[in-house]
Amino acid sequence: MCGNNMSTPLPAIVPAARKATAAVIFLHGLGDTGHGWAEAFAGIRSSHIKYICPHAPVRPVTLNMNVAMPSWFDIIGLSPDSQEDESGIKQAAENIKALIDQEVKNGIPSNRIILGGFSQGGALSLYTALTTQQKLAGVTALSCWLPLRASFPQGPIGGANRDISILQCHGDCDPLVPLMFGSLTVEKLKTLVNPANVTFKTYEGMMHSSCQQEMMDVKQFIDKLLPPID
């Protein structure tokens, strides 16, 4: 997946129970792997959808005293005005676009692919969807933020995904990525894409994690946008 890091293992995959006619690519958070999310999607799967949960390359993370861990890009700080790893974010987005291209080669059109992620992975999924020329079905962005927000226009984006459907979810007790980040992100997203297609759901008492209700909302979003076609 990552041309610059051949040691990254192959993604965790929940294969479709029959011929795959759609796919979900979901990116884990900092320090995690794709395995836990693959298990979560196995619990809400639909038989015609393939779920792909790639693993981030291991790299030193400034926020964590340069300790090496799975990370899509470097995180320097968690405050709204922290410096961002612009080149790392852009390279990571290119790697995800290559993964989407691979699925298109495998026979799944890009408009039958939903991109998503949790925390750092959710941030990367939003950035990738808003900058790619591949028309996607939607984005499911959990407990996250929009990286490099100043790089986006004041008005709507051009390109393939100006009408993309976005489900953004956040816990109202998140101590790591505060709910305010989610609220600011959703307001920005509504200026970049058709605001009628942006949904923001919050979960009472949820911290920086997921919950059963959220996963059911994610399933409903996926199944609505990626219905069976045969």
From Swiss-Prot:
Biological process according to GO: fatty acid metabolic process; fatty acid transport; negative regulation of aggrephagy; negative regulation of Golgi to plasma membrane protein transport; protein depalmitoylation
Molecular functions per Gene Ontology: carboxylic ester hydrolase activity; lipase activity; lysophospholipase activity; palmitoyl-(protein) hydrolase activity; phospholipase activity
Keyword vocabulary terms for this entry: Acetylation, Cell membrane, Cytoplasm, Endoplasmic reticulum, Fatty acid metabolism, Hydrolase, Lipid metabolism, Membrane, Nucleus
UniProt tissue specificity: Platelets.
Regulation: Inhibited by palmostatin-B, leading to impair depalmitoylating of Ras.
Sequence positions bearing N6-acetyllysine: 224
Subcellular location: Cytoplasm; Cell membrane; Nucleus membrane; Endoplasmic reticulum
Gene3D superfamilies: alpha/beta hydrolase (3.40.50.1820)
Catalysed reaction, written as an equation: S-hexadecanoyl-L-cysteinyl-[protein] + H2O = L-cysteinyl-[protein] + hexadecanoate + H(+); 1-hexadecanoyl-sn-glycero-3-phosphocholine + H2O = sn-glycerol 3-phosphocholine + hexadecanoate + H(+); a 1-(9Z-octadecenoyl)-2-acyl-sn-glycero-3-phosphocholine + H2O = a 2-acyl-sn-glycero-3-phosphocholine + (9Z)-octadecenoate + H(+)
Class in the EC hierarchy, top level: hydrolase
Oligomer status and interactors: Homodimer.
Name this protein carries in UniProt: Acyl-protein thioesterase 1
Organism whose genome encodes this protein: Homo sapiens (Human)
